[in-house]
């Protein structure tokens, strides 16, 4: 699927955007981002009345809208205000934004362990939703096609289908399955802001607000307060998008090793279809005739798999990716959870993404 051919967002999002007369604006952000535009004045749109009303409507429809943050307020408390007052309240937040502390709770996992979940206040959730609505189309235009977590019209089923395609059609039977150690707790804030800047998100006021969100104090169940210097808490409205921004660089690094390698500066590999799109079939044919080693990535949030041809290539990929994550993203892997698997012997354990459904439910705040 080419970037320019990606599906539009879910119908519910489209309905909200159309109702608040924002769809054309969001479509323009996507189109401009595809063309490489730099965005330096996003706060005007983020803090606009229409965007705030749409964010309020979206948060109100979430199952977690009745869950209180540290201030004990829920969407029912904001519902007591008329539209003019809650819009003014959110706009006031943007003028000098300092988020309230995030309440941390432990959500049980099927294996008996727990997952830490950060619950911002209801006002901070609406602020984050306002930012998300504007940043998402800009980032979607930059994201790699085979990243499937927390994105419009993508799911675990799509990730599994892509894995099956690489196995059954491309005959790539070796998988490098890498687990990033405590990914959400170890995101480097400086690197993340730099990645957003390189994506064209260069509104300095907005980037300062996002820094404030990332540094929001965390209140534990025992009353202890943490002041994070890294990480993005699971449970934040903006956290899934930010995690995809961080790992998008990994996606494109892997893609540049084979899948998109011809796109980088060599015109002889490029041939256009009748409609003007790039003929990928022609490029793949040339690649297969070369001495290059095929490698593909399929990613769902921080869970990703690398597909290659044989054992030697797999272990080289394992070592190179581990080093790249450490040097480029300041992230470590979990050796005990990371492995190289021969799918002819162990198919199901390495291709299943069904355990990721837990992420989809707990993040609906």
Residue spans for each PLM region:
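Basic Arg/Gly/Lys-rich low-complexity intrinsically disordered segments
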Residues: 12
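Conserved small/polar residues in nucleotide/adenosyl-binding loops
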Residues: 354-361
